[in-house]
Amino acid sequence: MKNKKFILFVLVPVFVHMFLFSVGPIIAGFGISLMDYNPLRDSNTFAGLKNFKELFADEVLVKALFNTLMFVGITVALNITLSLMIAQFISMFKSNKIRSFFRMAFFLPCVAPLVASSVVWARSIFPTATGLANMMLKTIGFDPVNWLGDPNILMWSIIVFTIWVDIGYNIILFSAGIDSIPTNFYEAAEMDGASAWHKFRHITLPLLGRTMTFVTIMTLISHFQMFAQFSVMVLKSGPQNSGLVLTSYIYKMAFEIKNMGYASAIAVLLFVIIFIITIIQQKIQKVDWDY
């Protein structure tokens, strides 16, 4: 009886917090998306599916959706590939001190606030005249690049920054997954004369199935929701809306144009996209075995 009371004592605050700050806002967002809602008005009218119908005719939304899918697709693919390669490289060292050093070094950017890191990159690395990136290009004979002002380069600049700031978290997860694989699998493979590539391909990669699923889903969700770097680095959606993504468009519609009903409809669209991709990802990477 005491154990049940303790469990309730621990779980009830968690569920209350989850409902107030997760489930509640989602339900409220669905409700607001069906209204012509402006917080500055005394009364707001029910609009039905009007906001959702406008989604299909909004060319700016189409551009934001394209930018979002491009950003997420490239960053997630590069993030997972590079973090797995780096984690595998770190696991090759026998010394725990060396492995811990590399893990700490790669994880440090994750500790800094994302807004602060975005400001540092925007003001110290990417500026056309005085930025570190262009200074390095000049030393090897290349012309300076307008990293945050060229519509063809802006998104790639943010992709590079996002990978730098976010890759350390997945390196830690993959390193933990690799360390948990029993060494007898590798010992048996060495006795059979397997190369390092074959051990990675036929042992490490398959046995990281659950870790890979978790990392992929969490990275997808977090990158779909990223907002800080676009808010800091991109000036007014960027040239030709090249830096506009769904999260920044939601913010613009809700807090600049004050059309929260339409902003909520875009948020519902983003929620549906994330939900569908997560379900598909779970089906594709489903793992039914254990070791």
Which residues fall in each region the model found?
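A structural signal for multi-pass alpha-helical bundles of membrane permease subunits
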Residues: 3-291
